[in-house]
Design a protein with these regions (language model features):
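Short beta-strand to alpha-helix junction loop
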Residues: 70-88, 100, 184, 254-263, ...
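Feature captures the FAD/FMN-dependent oxidoreductase FAD-binding
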Residues: 73-145, 306, 321
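Glycine/threonine-rich phosphate-binding loop and adjacent beta-strand/alpha-helix elements that clamp
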Residues: 51, 343-411
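Alpha/beta-hydrolase fold catalytic core
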Residues: 273-329, 333-336
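Rossmann-like dinucleotide-binding core of oxidoreductases
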Residues: 2-5, 9-11, 15, 19-20, ...
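Beta1-alpha1 glycine-rich phosphate/pyrophosphate-binding loop at the start
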Residues: 6-10, 15-99, 208-209, 272-278
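Short hydrophobic core segments
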Residues: 11, 105, 131-144, 181-184, ...
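C-terminal active-site-capping segments
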Residues: 398, 402-502
Length: 502
């Protein structure tokens, strides 16, 4: 990078960060930018996770970028293919030369007099502190800790003589061929791992405390195949993308408005894929409503096939203690295991652990309110990417990056330099992420909040957000535009969080 000052500094070179850089290249080609990436490769999640079967749990027509058609055969794709898609996109837009690898961002300090961020990063290879400045800071570092997955207390684990691994740090030398494997967990990672490992293992047991809703979907989208045969890729892609957006929106809205009906449909579908007499209620019927937690996807019903074929089984119970040869359950049964995989979740980490300071005052993230799900009250010229909880991550990431480019062009047109979100006029606050999953509940008190009404309310609705973020007004009651040296957030708008609803 020729200069240590850029117009836009992007944190993270994963799916969101690469997309943000491409949007800048497409929509704001006059803006200078750099990307700081803590690791030594492009790809984020898709470069980090290496466990067997790693794949998307959203279709790639919506997880892919809006400007880069997904052309691979499978709609639910493997991690290697997704990683190559991200890297290919980066190359097409000349992003790699703007990336500083092995730079972990530590803190960023905003100065209103100069209308600039001063960003402190540490090189992960030399421990050297690097200082850069930027006019706009864009956090695309994901939502979880890369260096540490979540593992709950495991009673007696020190007595276990087998191999214990976490999917987030999969060992290169682990060979599970012919081994007895226990996968602890029932979320997306477990649902992915079990059928993949069952192909070579002696047997795989999915040990879950409680079940998850699992939906079998075809790995290939037959309608997409038909459309792609008749239309060029650039024409077919948005058609299939919107078809999938509408289907997922209907699924979510129906789950919210008629949860009993959706429960019955999912239960009936699972029962049809499992052996006759299988205890579907115990192992595949959760106590909560659909979309209180994310639905898991089984491409081509692979998990159900493994259970039906006897290469995998599901045990719903709690752990009493580990033994030398496996796991003893509260029921008294013991599950033998040569390998135990703790697919027990992630540790959420807001902004990748970045600390923010505005004019010498530390920003308390839980006291901020998200504006349009992408900026924080009282924090000037700062944006973050937080994807949808009920649809693919990239749908929202694309909208956020596009909206940021609209903001930058607006600032240039009007001669302004600073945009600062304001807190909502009412005192009501709700959690930013509306899920009851364990990884969310463990971290909810460390995250920003959302308000009760727009533009501080997240609606988790892509079609609605397209109207708001691509075509809506940039000037509203939620933001203030100003120049360097001007007061950006009046004192009387710095309201405390007086009430909170969960």
């Amino acid at each position: 990078m020729a200069s240590d000052h850029v117009d836009v500094l992007i944190i993270g070179a994963g799916l969101s960060g690469i997309g943000a850089a491409c949007h800048l290249r497409r929509d704001c080609p006059d803006k200078t930018y750099a990307v700081l990436e803590a690791r030594d490769a492009i790809g984020g999640t898709w470069d980090l996770f290496r466990y067997p079967g790693i794949r998307s749990d959203s279709d790639m027509f919506t997880l892919g970028y809006s400007f880069k058609p997904w052309t691979a055969p499978k709609a639910i794709a493997d991690g290697t293919t997704i990683l190559e898609y991200v890297r290919e996109t980066a190359r097409e837009y000349d992003v790699p030369r703007h990336i500083r690898f092995r730079h972990r961002v530590l803190r960023a300090e905003w100065d209103s007099d100069t209308a600039r961020w001063t960003v402190h990063a540490q090189r992960t290879d030399t421990a050297e502190i690097v200082v850069l400045t930027c006019s706009f800071l864009f956090a695309c570092a994901g939502y979880y800790r890369y260096d540490e997955g979540y593992t709950p207390p495991l009673p007696g684990v020190d007595a276990y003589a087998g191999r214990l691994v976490h999917p987030q740090h999969w060992p290169d030398d682990l060979d599970h061929s012919g081994k007895r494997v226990v996968v602890i967990g029932s979320g997306a990672t477990a649902v992915t791992l079990v059928p993949a490992m069952a192909q070579r293992a002696a047997h795989v047991t999915m040990l879950q405390r409680s079940p998850t809703y699992i939906l079998a979907l075809p790995a290939r989208d037959r309608l997409a195949d038909a459309v792609r045969r008749r239309l060029p890729a650039k024409a077919a892609y948005p058609v299939v993308r919107w078809k999938n957006v509408l289907l997922s929106t209907v699924n979510f809205q129906l789950s919210r408005r008629a949860p009993g009906l959706v429960k019955r449909v999912l239960r009936r579908a699972a029962r049809g894929l499992l052996p006759v007499g299988y205890d579907v209620d115990r192992h595949f019927s959760p106590r909560y409503n659909p979309w209180d937690q994310r639905l898991c996807v089984a491409p081509d019903g692979d998990l159900f096939t493994a259970v039906r074929d006897g290469t995998a089984s599901v045990v719903t119970d709690t752990i009493d203690t580990f033994t030398a040869s496996g796991v003893r359950l509260t029921s008294g049964a013991e599950v033998p295991a040569d390998i135990v995989v703790t697919a027990t979740g992630l540790n959420l980490l807001a902004l990748g652990g970045l600390t923010l300071r505005v004019d010498g005052v530390d920003v308390d993230l839980p006291s901020t309110v998200a504006y349009k799900g992408m900026m924080l009250s009282g924090v000037p010229n700062f944006a973050l990417t937080l994807g949808y909880t009920n649809a693919s991550w990239t749908l929202k990431a694309d909208l956020v990056a596009g909206y940021l480019c609209r903001l930058l062009r607006h600032l240039d047109r009007t001669g302004q330099q600073v945009v600062t979100p304001l807190p909502p006029p009412d005192a009501e606050r709700v959690p930013l992420i509306d899920l009851r999953s364990g990884y969310v509940l463990r971290a909810v008190d460390t995250l920003p909040k959302q308000g009760a009404t727009a533009p501080w309310r997240l609606h988790q609705n892509y079609a609605r957000d397209v109207l708001l973020m691509r075509h809506g007004r940039l000037t509203d009651e939620g933001v203030r535009f100003s120049r360097a040296g001007e007061v950006t957030v009046p004192e009387d708008t710095r309201r405390p969080v007086a009430s909170e609803r969960r």
